[in-house]
């Protein structure tokens, strides 16, 4: 596991595809005053279509068969649920995968897991506990969307 995390750090730092920017950047508003962007929250996740660079403290990952790119907070890597996803990735792709980390999980499931972590965890949410248990066992369920 340490080997995989070290490898992720090197990929995020050295990849020519991604440039790391400072977590607080300034810009001028209409009146010419500088404003600072707040750094992203620790449990943040950003779809790639909105993010061209990888902020400091974040790691790019590809999720699902669609290989949709997300930028995930490095703090998330220590959570037991995400460690399970990393273990599943290592089983499926091995530790020698090159480039960005691939997470073998449906995009909708990944988004729900990260959103639940951001909102405070899995305590008391039976549906998500079942979803994560099935995710880590390899029997992936795709939740219904209410769009």
UniProtKB/Swiss-Prot annotation:
Keywords: Auxin signaling pathway, Cytoplasm, Developmental protein, Growth regulation. It is found in: Cytoplasm. GO terms for cellular component: cytoplasm. InterPro entries: SAUR_fam. Specifically expressed in the quiescent center and cortex or endodermis initials of root stem niches. Expressed in vascular tissues from hypocotyls, petioles and cotyledons. Plants over-expressing SAUR41 display pleiotropic auxin-related phenotypes. These phenotypes include elongated hypocotyls, increased length of primary roots, increased numbers of lateral roots, increased vegetative biomass, twisted inflorescence stems, overexpanded petals, reduced seed setting and increased basipetal auxin transport in hypocotyls. Plays a role in the regulation of cell expansion, root meristem patterning and auxin transport. Belongs to the ARG7 family. This is Auxin-responsive protein SAUR41. It comes from Arabidopsis thaliana (Mouse-ear cress).
């Amino acid at each position: 596991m340490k080997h995989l995390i070290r490898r992720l750090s090197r990929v995020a730092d050295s990849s020519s595809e991604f440039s790391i920017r400072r977590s607080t950047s300034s810009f001028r508003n209409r009146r010419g005053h500088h404003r600072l962007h707040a750094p992203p929250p620790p449990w943040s996740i950003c779809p790639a279509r909105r993010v061209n660079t990888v902020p400091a403290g974040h790691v790019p990952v590809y999720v699902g068969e669609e290989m949709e790119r997300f930028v995930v907070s490095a703090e998330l890597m220590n959570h037991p649920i995400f460690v399970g996803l990393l273990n599943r990735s290592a089983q499926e792709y091995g530790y020698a995968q090159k480039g960005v980390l691939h997470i073998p999980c449906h995009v909708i499931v990944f988004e729900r897991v990260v959103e639940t972590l951001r909102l405070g965890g899995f305590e008391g949410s039976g549906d998500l506990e079942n979803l994560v248990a099935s995710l880590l066992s390899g029997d992936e369920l795709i939740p219904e969307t209410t769009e």
